[in-house]
């Protein structure tokens, strides 16, 4: 952290892309260093608690600016600016093209954390908490039958969008993966004292190799004022660059928002998750255009 304090002030903008376990501390250090930030660390802490610090130091931090959370929040923020939104659902997953397996496009420890942290969602205006991996449902996506289950993905939406009576985020995996993870969790492999060992074992099994093809799929459904809006994102490993779809969809969303800060299109200090940024239609349209220019399939169905 001392090294960050020493070098961060030399830059106009810093992208914080560290493991979630240290993300909050690093973001706090960057704000104390008075530098603008785009954060894609997805730390478990409530990042909105740093808003006063960001304002005090006159810096802007766009947080959770990946694909989900991130792009889905931007889409919701856009519609919430002119619709009386009644429900929001996000189904999202990054998977290998080889069926019925799993490869982690980011830290296995962060994936495991998704499977152990209680999942919070909003139902009829109340926060409901269930076990992660609960409420499985089959979902057809791009001709594939996948399985969705609860994960704690709403994050900042629980605070910023309290007026929306129904909100849910679910993770997508191949059928069968959920049952394997429940077995490991219930057998104690995901307990804190065993996590380092489990992560090492799963890292070898889940490691995305250079020539592994994978894809990212997201479906966002928003209902309100007797309207229904469904957006779908689909991207695959880039055959030429070998960049994974998760890298592309997360990284390019982050880059689009970096452009907003560096071109002085925002100019307000504070902590801003995607739903607060997406309320401005010009930002929403900029992000959608930025992704489409990079051949990421993103359409309103």
What are the roles of these predicted feature ranges?
Residues 1-11:
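Conserved Rossmann-fold cofactor-binding substructure of NAD(P)-dependent oxidoreductases
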Residues 82-301:
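C-terminal catalytic/substrate-binding lobe primarily of soluble NAD(P)-dependent oxidoreductases
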Residues 57-96:
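Adenosine-phosphate binding glycine-rich loop
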Residues 13-30, 43-47:
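Beta-loop-alpha module in the N-terminal Rossmann-like domain of NAD(P)-dependent dehydrogenases
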Residues 12-13, 36:
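Structural motif
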Residues 1, 20, 41-46, 66-68:
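Short, acidic/turn-prone active-site loops that include or flank metal/cofactor-
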Residues 40-64:
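Rossmann-fold NAD(P)-binding glycine/threonine-rich loop
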């Amino acid at each position: 952290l001392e090294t960050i304090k020493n070098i961060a002030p030399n830059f106009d903008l810093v992208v914080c892309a560290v493991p979630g376990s240290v993300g909050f501390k690093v973001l706090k250090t960057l704000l104390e260093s008075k530098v603008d930030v785009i954060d894609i660390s997805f730390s478990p802490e409530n990042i909105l608690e740093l808003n006063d610090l960001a304002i005090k130091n006159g810096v802007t931090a766009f947080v959770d600016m990946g694909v989900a959370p991130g792009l889905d929040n931007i889409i919701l923020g856009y519609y919430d600016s002119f619709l009386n939104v009644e429900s929001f659902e996000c189904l999202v997953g990054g998977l290998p093209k080889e069926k019925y397996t799993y490869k982690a496009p980011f830290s296995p420890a962060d994936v495991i954390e998704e499977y152990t942290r209680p999942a919070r969602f909003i139902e009829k205006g109340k926060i409901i908490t269930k076990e992660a991996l609960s409420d499985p449902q089959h979902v057809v996506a791009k001709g594939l039958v996948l399985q969705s289950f609860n994960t704690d993905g709403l994050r900042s939406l629980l605070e910023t969008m309290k007026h929306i009576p129904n909100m849910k985020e679910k993770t997508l995996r191949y059928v069968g993966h959920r049952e394997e993870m429940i077995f490991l969790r219930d057998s104690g492999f995901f307990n804190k004292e065993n996590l380092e060992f489990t992560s090492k074992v799963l890292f070898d099994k889940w490691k995305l190799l250079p020539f592994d093809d994978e894809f990212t799929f997201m479906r966002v459904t928003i209902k309100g004022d007797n309207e229904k809006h469904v957006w779908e994102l689909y991207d695959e490993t880039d055959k030429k660059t070998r960049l994974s779809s998760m890298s592309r969809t997360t990284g390019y969303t982050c880059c689009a928002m970096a452009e907003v800060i560096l071109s002085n299109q925002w100019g307000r200090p504070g902590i801003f998750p995607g739903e607060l940024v997406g309320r401005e239609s010009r930002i929403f349209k900029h992000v959608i255009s930025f992704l489409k220019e990079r051949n990421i399939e993103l359409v309103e169905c």
